[in-house]
Amino acid sequence: MEQPTKIVSVAALPQVRVLGRTTGTDVVNLFWTGSGIEFIYTGSEIQVAVNADYDAYEPWLAVELNGVQIGRVPLNKGKNEVCLFRGMTVGKPKHVRILKEVQAMHQDPGHLLQIVGLQYADGEFQQLPEPKYRLEFVGDSITSGEGTVGAIYEEDWISAFFSAMNTYPRMVADALSAEYRVVSQSGWGIVTGWDGNVENKIPPFYTQVCGLLTGERNASLGALQDYDFEAWQPDAVIINLGTNDATAIQSAVELGQEWAGTRDVEEVKEILTTAICDFLKVVRNSNPTAQIIWGYGMLGDNFLSAIREAVEGYAEQTADSRIHFLQLPDTTPDTVGSRLHPGMKAHQITAKEIETYLQELL
């Protein structure tokens, strides 16, 4: 058995598919959850070389072999060489996917994950089959996979309790033989974050590669650049936003406080409706032919009717028959995960609902 030799950059391997909204060529910068690389390799052993860094929240990497997850590792600061498999049959194709498990970390400018290259010796790379569809998922902590790992009673907000592999975006994409990308941030919403911080909202950053990141290094890596929508047009965009808005607004109501300068819930709904319509316009302009599905309800139905009416109203006003609202299954005591978030079972149930809905549309 030959030993792995030099590290070869992904740019030098055209058979390797880069996943997610990324930047870089020789070194691939992974920002969002679910970003990574995918390839088919015939050798007995292969390693991936990555650079990692963080101040508070370390990046985690998931390794999938022939459709089954075989590894999940936290990464140390600096250079890491992760063996993906060793001692397997030479000449037999192995389908490998490596995914970033942790979301883009807005509150940790030191958070970094880069794929430097692959190290191998005795095999060849084969062409991947073309994905049947391209799907984009936009959301909050649910879409980021918060709570899909860990015991139910866990409350600490740490990287370990996030997982791209255990989320409905990955499940839906795999069921439909699709390539997917994710734009999501825990605690963020349409018009406000869970704590009432109106700066923490996804829509203003949608048209950038990963504009919600902070720090000079992220800027230098291209996170704040305009995203090239034409280079990767999705067949469907699935949005799951509103849970954090509902939390913030309901908290203000219960405490008798103003939100956005008003105590009038109907005025708040108008603000929410306007923001939803504005965001749908941006998503449609960016993805002219995509089916757009706004899903909601995995953590309760507060403001569900307002969100549904906003989405369906916009579709009607614009005569856009490719915009839809889908009520998602609520999380139950049997399907809850850590941090009082939907667990993997909840994601499996939701994934099936979205998969079935997409099959009717695509």
Give residue spans per PLM region.
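Surface-exposed acidic, glycine-flexible loop patches that form ligand/cofactor-binding
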Residues: 126-128, 223-233, 281-287, 360-361
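Extracellular serine-dependent O-acyl
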Residues: 291-338, 345-362
